[in-house]
Design a protein with these regions (language model features):
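Active-site histidine-anchored catalytic micro-motif
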Residues: 2-6, 11-159
Length: 159
């Protein structure tokens, strides 16, 4: 059973009474679409380094419905497999309702891929270092059918 914390002399509430810093960075990244994968690990690491925070979490969020942020082993085989997977799992098809109900649209599959993968990842950090595994990299995947500039929000919460 979860019991809400109360003020006063409750030791648990005292432990959580300090304020946590929140830093937000916005990046704009030109992308080509067609399941393009762009490694975001360095920009995220750089944003974290600029805060001086030692422990907390970093959330990387893309402000678009036809792109996703994920963690992968970023190597050419996985990039090719990722594209092949999405092409098989959610193929481009002019019969998607988004395409048939909206004149000129051809990216219904792009929206569905974005929905399934999701717009964000959250990574813990300690001693100012992301706690990623040896082969884990943060990437942006653009599922759209055309080029556009994507906005990525990096929000860092910690102390």
């Amino acid at each position: 059973m979860v019991v809400p914390l109360r003020g006063g002399s409750d030791k648990r509430s005292e432990r959580w009474s300090h304020k946590m810093a929140v830093k937000t960075v916005s990046l704009r990244l030109p992308m080509q679409g067609n399941t393009q994968i762009e490694n975001m690990t360095k920009p995220v690491t750089d944003a974290l380094a600029g805060t001086g925070l030692l422990a907390g979490v970093v959330t990387v969020f893309v402000k678009h419905t036809t792109a996703s942020v994920m963690i992968i082993e970023d190597e050419p085989g996985i990039r090719a497999d990722t594209k092949a997977f999405w092409d098989r799992a959610v193929p481009a098809d002019p019969a998607w309702q988004h395409n048939t109900r909206n004149a000129g649209e051809d990216n219904g599959h792009s929206h569905l891929r974005g929905q399934l993968q999701g717009p964000s990842v959250t990574i813990p950090f300690l001693d100012g270092v992301l706690l990623l595994g040896t082969w884990q990299q943060i990437v942006l995947v653009d599922f759209d059918t055309r080029s556009r500039t994507r906005e990525i929000i990096i929000q860092i919460m910690g102390e």
